[in-house]
């Protein structure tokens, strides 16, 4: 499975919403697709499923605003 597809699947699971796969440029925080509690779950799932540790200190909502931006950020951290 392609890395981007893995990340989008993970996002869809955490958000409980497939819109992140259908529109990877959707603003997930502005649109209320992911809230602050789900953000913590997202970071844990990234570590568990992808083996990429992301500190809450490294998390920036602007840099992680869309699924595509999240994929880019995680590719840099791989």
Swiss-Prot record:
It is found in: Cytoplasm. One of its GO terms (molecular function) is D-alanyl carrier activity. Keywords: Cell wall biogenesis/degradation, Cytoplasm, Phosphopantetheine, Phosphoprotein. Residues 1-78 form the Carrier domain. The modification O-(pantetheine 4'-phosphoryl)serine is found at residue 36. Belongs to the DltC family. This is D-alanyl carrier protein. It comes from Staphylococcus haemolyticus (strain JCSC1435). The gene is dltC.
């Amino acid at each position: 499975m392609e890395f981007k597809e893995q990340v989008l699947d993970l996002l869809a699971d955490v958000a409980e919403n497939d819109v992140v796969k259908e529109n990877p440029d959707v603003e997930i925080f502005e649109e209320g697709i992911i809230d602050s509690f789900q953000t913590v779950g997202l970071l844990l799932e990234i570590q568990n499923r992808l083996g990429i540790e992301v500190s809450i200190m490294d998390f920036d909502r602007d840099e992680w605003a869309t699924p595509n931006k999240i994929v880019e950020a995680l590719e840099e951290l791989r």
